[in-house]
Amino acid sequence: MSRFILAFCSFIICLSCKNETKSIEALTAKEPTFAIVIHGGAGTILKKNITPEKEALYKAKLEEAIKVGYQILKNGGSSLDAVQKTINVLEDSPLFNAGKGAVFTNAGTNEHDASIMDGKTLNAGASAGTKTVKNPIDLARAIMEHSPHVMLSGEGAEQFATEQDLHIVDTSYFYTENRFNSLQKVKASEQVAFYDDTIKDSKFGTVGCAALDKNGNLAAGTSTGGMTNKRWGRIGDSPIIGAGTYANNNTCAISCTGWGEFFIRSVVAHDISALMEYKGLSIEEAAKEVIQNKVPALGGDGGIIGVDKHGNIAMEFNTAGMYRATMNANGDLYIGIYGE
């Protein structure tokens, strides 16, 4: 009888252990997280200088763009695809200084820069000074995946884009009256740099995206028309890996917008990642240290958007505003413009 009782007790204990194991498995087998964050430039973006109608246009385009990337991530797509397709939407809009809405150089031309980085492999691609590639972020990805190089520029980059069957357009495609008028204002004010507080809605025109997919892979990308009235083939931080764009699965994915010269000197995107990796800072702490302390100490302005490997979002800027939006795995949407 005692043997029977002992055997029965053993059976109950075993069954209990199995049920407990199943309960633990159920708890740990939750849906993988993902997140996406975008920006459309930072700068002297003041509510008093933007009409309600214009504000609505900006918010609508930010929402349209981020929902493209969100849907890709929700369906199990890669962070690279989400970043690229989201930036495509912003590049195709004349509202932002990238692609269609690119600013004018001193010579009256439009020159585009872009970069993209894969946090899983640390592969990256970038292009600078192109004039006929409709979507520079597509070129950056093609360089990353179909060339042995990281960065191509000018005519060589355009030749590669043609060989890759990317969308090539006439330079007139990039003309917008608003951007052309901005060039005339900057020239009239005798400002060499594009950051002129006396010009309404002066902003560091750049677009960017950072994303975490369900597989835990991070990616970031940035695209821009650069600086209004720029000369001599000037290139800012946007196509510079580590300065304007950086992604590493161990830490975070970052896209920057700001006064490019200072972001290059500060290696902003990589510095945030390094502070997380070597000092154990959170993405919020690292972003704040770089954007609120390090960059201003040199005299620079701007902001960043980023996401870490856990899906935590950072949107840090030291200017009056930054066009920005985020979405998480729950579908929660946030859109911001000013320093609220």
Could you say what each language-model-derived stretch is?
Residues S2-F8:
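Sec-dependent signal peptide recognition
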Residues I13-S16:
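C-terminal motif of bacterial Sec signal peptides marking the signal peptidase cleavage site
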Residues K18-E340:
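Alpha/propeptide regions of enzymes that mature by internal proteolysis
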